[in-house]
Amino acid sequence: MFSRWGEFAYQHRRVIPLVVVAVIILLYLTFGMRLSDRMSQEGWDDPNSDSTTAAAIEARTFGRDNNGDVILLFTAETGTIDESPEFGHIQEYLTNLLANHPDQIDHITSYFDKRVDRLISQDKRTAFAAIALKGDGDQTLKDFRAIKVQLAGASRMFPGVSTQVAGATAVADALDEGMSQDISRAEFYALPAVALLLLVVFGSLVAACMPLIVGGLSIVGSLGMLSILAGFTQVNVFAHSVVTLLGLGLAIDYGLFMVSRFREELNRGGGQDVRTAVRRATGTAGKTVVFSAAMVAVALSGLLVFPQAFLKSVAYGAISAVGLAAVLSVTMLPALFSLLGHNIDKFMVRRPRWVGVTGVVARALGRGRQGGQAGQRSARGRGRSRSYSHSRAAAATPATASKGSKKLSETWWYRLPNWSMQHAVWVTCAIVGGLMLLALPIGDVEFGGINETYLPPTNQVRTAQSTFDREFPEFRTEPIKLVVTNADNDQLIQVYQQAAQVEGLTGRFTPTSATKDGITVLSAGIVDRAHNQSVVDQLRAIEPPPGVKVYVGGTPALEIESIEALFDKLPLMSFYIVLATLVLMALVFGSLVLPAKAVIMTLLGMGATIGLLTWMFVDGVGANLFGFTPGPLMSPVLVLIMAIIYGLSTDYEVFLVSRMVEARERRAATDVAIKFGTAHTGGIISAAAIIMIVVCGAFGFSDIVMMKYIAFGMIFALLFDATIIRMMLVPAVMHLLQDDNWWAPPWVKSAAGALGHRVSRNQGQGQGQGRGRGRGQSGRPKRAPRPQPQPPRAAQPRQPARPVRRPRTNIPEPDSRASVRMEQDRASSSKQPSNQHPRREETIELATGNLPPQRFNKPRTTSPSTHRHFSPTTGRNTKQVPFTELLKRLESED
C-alpha cells in the first residue's frame, strides 16, 4: 500500500506540494489566527467530584466567588500606610478604576474606604484592595487584561508607596504569558539550532531543509487544528505549548527518517532511478513513520480515560499534531523527493572532523550521493561486477553493507551492539539494575495543584502573591469551604462545631454570606498547602445531621479530588496503552515476543525518568541552577509526561526493530539481523534524539515549572532510550532470546502479512547462530533432512597455487534460481539416502581440485546469511561463518 502511494506521489509530484501547502495555509488563515480567543484556562479539575458540585451550588446561589480575582497591595516604604501622604490619592485612584471599567469590575473592597482592620497588616505598613471581576470562566482573564495596563501604572503614581498585583487571575495571566514566551523561544532558538544540526547530519543544504519544511508546516497546521477542536470541546491554553513541542519535534524526526531512507535507496546498488527510490523509501520508511505515529497517538489517547478536560484537550491536540506530522512526511516529502531526485544532495557542505557526536552521527548516516559514487568507483577499480558488489547477501549484512563511503561494520552503531551481545548477560543485569536504582526516588513523589510557585522566583506576580499570603493568611486566595444544604439553625450549629475541631486551619470557619435558599457556605484558610490532604480528610469525616448534605469545596478540595480521580483511572489507562501498543507492534513485527520486550524496556526507562524528575523537582536537585522552586508535582502533568515518554519510547523501538525485521525477512540470522538493524538505524535514531533534545531544551528554559518538568522528562527519556536502552539493552536481550524473538502464532503472522510485511511462514525456524532454538509456526522444532555427502572424485594433479578466476556459474547470488536448480541436479544424482540427523543450516559444498569450493544454497531450509564451512582436509564441518564472509574470502582468492 505504501509503495503504491510512493508511486502515486511520484506521478503527481508537481500537484501534491501545491495542494498540501494551500490546505495548510487555508487552515491557518481560517481557524488558526483565532486560536488565542478560543483557548481556556480551565479544565484542571474532576467535573464529577463533590468539590466541583460544591462550587456549582455556590455559584448558582450566590454567584461566583470573585473576591480573590485581583489583589492590589499598597506598602508604605517608611512609616505606616495611614500616615502616608498618598493615602487619599490611592482612595481616589480606586474610585476612578471602578468608574472607568464598569464592564470588567464588579466591585472593589479596600482598606482605604472604611479602614477595616482585617484589611491591613499587623505592622500597619501594608493594606490591600480586592478587585472582583464580572466575567465567568475564560471571560475573567479577558477582563483582567482590559485593566492590566492601568493596574501596572499604579506603581509609578504614588511616591513613597510600592504597589504589587496579586490574585488568582493575575497568576493565571502570568502563567499564560510564560507559555506564550515558551513557544516564541522554541521557534526563535530551536529551529535555527535544529537547522544547523540537520546540515551537519546530512551535509547537504537541500536535504537539511526537507525536515524543516515538514516541521514548519506541522506547526502552522496544528494551530488551525487546535482552533477547530476548540470549537467543539474545551482546549486548555497549556495544550498549545505541548502540541508545539510534540508536533515540531516529531515532524522533524519523521522527516529525518524519510530523507535518510530516500538517500539510501537512491544510492543502493550503484544508484537507482528516482522513481524506484521514492517508491521504496515510502514503502519502508513511510510505513514505519505511519505506524510509529500510531504508537504515539495510542499512548496519548490513553489520556482520554481521565475526566479532566485539560488532559482531554492535550490528547486531542497532540494526536492531531502527531497525525499531521506523519501525513506531511508521507505526502509532502515523497513528492519533493520526486522533484529533486539526485539534487537532494546539492550544495554539499564540508563537515569538520571536530564536530563530535553529531559528526559521528553524520558519518554513520553516510555522505549521500558523493559517498555512493566513491563506492562505485572503488568497486570498479577492483574489477568487481555491479551485480556481485551489491548482492542481496551484502545488503543483508552490516559487515559488508556500506552506506556512503564508510562501512557500517566500522561505525560505532555496529561495534557497540556487537560488544553488548558479546557480554549480553552482564550488560542486561547492569542496565536493568541501574534503571531500577534510578526509579527509587518515585517513592518520595508529592502531588499538588497549580499555583504561583509554578512561576519563576523572581516573577513580580509570584512575589506579590507570596507577600499577600504571608501578611494576610486568613485571606488566602485558596480557602477550604463547606457548602451545607437543607440545614436549619440547630443543624448548622452541629456542623459548625464539628468543623471547628479540624486541625491545620488558620482560624475558625466563617460564613461567606447569609444563608439563602437553605444553602450556607462556610470558609476558612489552611496554614500550609502540605496539610491540604489532612484537612480535607478531617472535613470528609464530619457526620451531618439527618437530611443535611455537606460538600467539601474550595481549591484544596478540588486539587485533592483531581489527584484521586487520576489514580483511580491510571490502571485503566496503563492497561489500554499497553494492550494497544502490543497489538500494533505485533502487526508491525510479526512477533509477540518483541512487543512484550519493548513494553518492559519502555517501563524501565519510564521509571528511571520519573525517578530523576522526582529527585530534581520534588527534592530540589538543580533548583537554583535552573531557576525553579521545588515542590509537589501537578498530578495531571505527571500523567501527561508518562504518556509522552511511553509514546516516544515505542516510537524509536519501531524504527529500530523494523530494520531488524527487514533483515529477517531476507532470512538473516538473529544476531546478523540485530547488527543490521542497529547499524542502519543507530545513527539516525541518535540524530533524531539529539534534534528532539534541542527542541525540548528550548522549553527547558521555560519560566513555567510544569513546562520545565515536561521538557526535562523528555530529555531524560530520550537520553536513556537512544543510548543504553536501544543501543545496548535491546541487542543484549535479543541476543539472549535468539530465534525466540520472532515467535508468534500463525494468525499474527497472517495479519502482519496482510499489512504488507514479508513474514515467512518459517521465520521462527532456526536460522540463526548461537544457542537459540529453531521454532516454526507452531513453536515446535522444524526438522529438515540433510543429504549425504557426495562420493569423492578422482584425484587430479595438483596445480600451482595461483589465483584462478572462477566461472560465473560457480558463484551464484544467494537464493537465485540457478543455484536452486544446480543443487537439485546434484541431489538427484546422488543415490545414497538422506538419513543423517538434521541441522539448522546446511549447504552442499563440493571440492573441485584447485578451484575454490563451490557452495550451493539448499532451497527453503537454508539461510543465505550463515553457513558451515566444509574443510576438504578434515572432511567435516568447522565453525559457522556469515555467508558474506565466505564471499569476501572468495574475493580475496580472485
Label each PLM-derived region with a short phrase.
Residues 1-38, 135-447, 557-826, 840, ...:
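Membrane-embedded transmembrane helical bundles of large multi-pass transporters/channels
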Residues 38-42, 450-451:
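Short hinge/gating elements
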Residues 42-43, 54:
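Juxtamembrane interface helices immediately C-terminal to a transmembrane segment
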Residues 48-67, 78-169, 442-625, 632, ...:
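Structured non-transmembrane domains adjacent to transmembrane bundles in polytopic membrane proteins
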Residues 830-831, 835-836, 850:
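Asparagine/serine/threonine-enriched low-complexity, disordered tracts
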Residues 847-894:
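Intrinsically disordered, compositionally biased tail regions
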